[in-house]
């Protein structure tokens, strides 16, 4: 039986007796609008944990369609299980949720079957906004950027880009209307875009605009397990794709280029000094006086530096470097796909197929990836079209090679294209470094797993010292994107602080910018410390790559909020100045100038200091003494950490054994994942997985080949197992092995 909701109905007294008490009903307004438009509420069951709630204005006998923006993995999620109109209350079951819908104000109480209330929603027709409860525990998500770790207490206008916002410390803003309540719920506001006011116990989401077709479309998830919440978001917007292995190595960015010799000299120095590096990135002319191309947005090479681009690329490739140039689109819109036809006589840069065609000549020369900058004015659909273009476009010419692109903009769903994201043009200050830890955590919780920052900060300030650079470098070694970039670019290479040369300054247009005094540019410690963290990053690649693979199956980021693994530890949930690196490592970056110690909260359980191997009981804050070369790292008891040899680039061949370090104190398991690192052959079974399990009570380690995988070279595999100073060597052939200690 259908009724039409309107204020006129309310005045006629059609509210009726409530099936359950909804607290907000006692706070109804007395005003009314006789001409209010009737609303139809659609409830669609997505899974046992997630349902869709759509508020659609009635247009005669029908409702408007819900527009698509590209964020969801599909447009249709099946028929609604309920279409509610009318002024009486309605009780609806959607998976594990029980919904009680009341007509005035339009209120929805969401509870479990046992009556435990999860959330209360209320639609305010006067302001066209949705009110919900913030709860008493932290709120996370809302994309990259934002002024605080716990989103409670903030007003978020959800404006994308770098202008008008606290760019200097907080970086660019990539807002995503996905909000997580750590008490066990989350919401993705699919349409339309809007503002979050989280400054009180009752939060408000106000769409930027509503239309005759749609008032609001959201997806609601309820689950006590944080991993389930992340998996449900991935169900809606997609799982991350596997990036190429080389993108997880070190990436060195350049700015103003003096000559061909300078470009080759940087590459040569990395190899001569044996400082691991995989990627060389070149800024475009227009963003600096002399970049890789001739002008902003151009695909023509700068002949003063790259007189023979193909020969130059071949030379860099021969030294095992990947090459990534900076690109800027000159249109504020982008539509279509790379598969569409492009009329070259009517070239339209806003058409993805036409714009991608402009890349293909340089790509054919040997370009390995792209750095698409800017895009702030783009709407959501255009941003996602751009991300998709840099994923699908390269595959037109190299169908079995994983693409790489480093973006400054995106939206929900960008993870489906293995997009990397960085935080924009931040300033070199201690406050910026400090801010980027919670910023990184919320970015990962918003479904963006591949994130990083300009190590050292983009704009140098009087705070830009060797110490700040080192601390930022240490943090960067534990970000998915490990990349140095910024003005005074010669101070961004690991040996730059011992040459006396900061490079072209290029700071004239930045208030508060400054170049370090030349007396500071002879510090030999910097290269030594950078080497330590470069080598550690490369040694940990087996662990990191396995965690990236795990994310493609679960939606979990590599940089993880402590909440994801310790949801019942209130101190861990509210901790925003440290994070988990995968499931085993706890990373506590040093963000204070001249720090001699670092306060670290260790969640409940036992922990091992990575550097000293000292075992410590968690559930408390400790004080870790530090020097300049030490960033506190802890490993969770009950962990198996695979480590490889030091390599100069990710694809370097080595006969050295794989090392498995066991951190005892609890049972442990780990899936080591390997594939060729470049192709999509893993989709067809070309991958190797080694299942590892540690039995704490028996002190035994079991190794076996993962189901549906097979051995990859070298076979047999030499494995060194370490436990409390003891070492055992074993050859793994694919057959199960059990070792005792």
Residue locations for each model-derived region?
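N-terminal accessory segment at the very beginning of proteins
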Residues: 1-246, 255, 260-262, 267-268, ...
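Catalytic-domain carbohydrate-binding cleft regions of carbohydrate-active enzymes
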Residues: 116-629
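Long, structured stretches of catalytic cores involved in phosphate-ester chemistry, encompassing
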Residues: 632
